[in-house]
Amino acid sequence: MLTQKAHDEDFSLNEYAIGYLLRSGALSEEDLLSFRPSVCNRLDRNTSGIVAVGKSVAGLQELSKLFHDRTVHKFYRTIVLGHIEKGRTIEGYLVKDRDENRVRILKEPVPESQQIRTRYTPLGWASDGNPGHDLTMLEIELITGRSHQIRAHLSSIGHAVAGDPKYGIRKRNDYFRREYQVRRQLLHADQITFPAAEGCLEHLSGRTFRAPLPDDFRRVMEGEKIREICEMHPSD
């Protein structure tokens, strides 16, 4: 489901959220005449997980500011190709190719490039003895938030996200599709933690929200026997 419509016939997350708010009584049809709730944090197409929706003018403004100022801590979970032994923070420069709807990651800045930082921590591994089949499950902290950042950044260091049609390896993607019915990149927006907040968002101050892993992710974990060696970033 897209956060916003790409085509008139699409059903968007915005519409889903509005429908939920109407059914729950948190919003009326009359309210929609002056304001329509909207998603504050967008995910890449076919990335699962948490999105935040502002259901009032003030709430949307404050939420959008928190995400814009990068004071909301955002954590993702992913399964990547290869073995990653230790966590680290990687940096680079992202350049968009609008014609191809892809990005490139460079070591040095060029005109129109955007600096990016991505922090990852290994959570578990799987290996069948063939190094070409190794998998690592990672926790990702998105320090900067650019379109395709996590997927392209990890691919640029030789650890593509499993199932990724843009930045992944086709032969391995075919394997995950055949064995586990994976039809997308295995990237999940797992957790967000809010900073100290005031005003209309005071009730969110310091709170953490988690989204359960989707079925395709769990099928790969179970089928490949990925062994978890530590917990995700602890909830407050």
Model-derived segments and their meaning:
Residues 63, 146-154:
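Short beta-strand segments enriched for Tyr within beta-sheet-rich domains
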Residues 72-76, 86, 90, 116-118, ...:
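A generic structural signal for short beta-strands and their flanking turns/coil linkers
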Residues 1-100, 109-114, 124-127, 131, ...:
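RNA pseudouridine synthases
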Residues 57, 143-144:
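Loop/turn elements at beta-strand to alpha-helix junctions within RNA-recognition modules
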Residues 110-111, 128-133, 143, 153-236:
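Pseudouridine synthases involved in rRNA/tRNA modification
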Residues 52, 78, 120, 150, ...:
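Residue-level signal for inorganic ion chemistry
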Residues 138-141:
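Short histidine-centered loop motifs in beta-beta connectors
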